Amino acid sequence: MTESSRTLIIACAVMKDELLAVNHAPNIQIEFLEQALHRTPAKMPGAIQEKIHQADGYDYIVLGYGSCGNGIAGVRAEKRPLVIPKAHDCITLLFGSLQAHLKEHEKVPGTYYLTKGWIEEVKDPLGVLEEYTQRYGRKTAEWVLEQEFKNYKRIVLVTNGTF
């Protein structure tokens, strides 16, 4: 990539504040896709692929996604280089490296990570409880949430200076 190369970043909306905070280059544009694609990872590649096909006029495309439950499987760009981070999920991206993520994970393996974007998308534990309550009723929602979170020991808020 050169300084004059036009680059499109296609990223998850949960990373919006972090990416906007560091992008000051006029030749880099960012398009955000809805976080809800994480609930249906089978639909994620198609949504990303559609954005890639619409990316005329760019020299490079960068994905702002980790592998996200194989949500980027099969995504490709025929006309230009496609840069895909080597990351399991967005938390690794937000930590800056796999090593930094693993270092934090080793402190307490049962850690639930939250970011400003996840909270704003109401995907924090309370938001998930509300979503499940509407879907299943309160008693079943509490049981499902308890099952989902039973192995977590702590919650860590990853801020990166955007809060």
Give, region by region, the residue ranges found by the protein language model.
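Gly/Ser/Thr-rich loops at beta-strand to alpha-helix junctions
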Residues: 10-17, 37-38, 62-73, 88-89, ...
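Structural motif
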Residues: 8, 59-62, 154
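Glycine-rich loop at the start of a catalytic domain that most often binds anionic cofactors/ligands
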Residues: 73-80
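N-terminal basic/disordered segments at the start of proteins
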Residues: 1-25
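Active-site rim beta-loop-alpha module in soluble metabolic enzymes
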Residues: 109-163
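Long, charge-dense
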Residues: 80-126
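A short beta-strand-loop structural module common to alpha/beta enzyme folds
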Residues: 27-43
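Short, well-structured alpha-helical segments in soluble
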Residues: 46-57
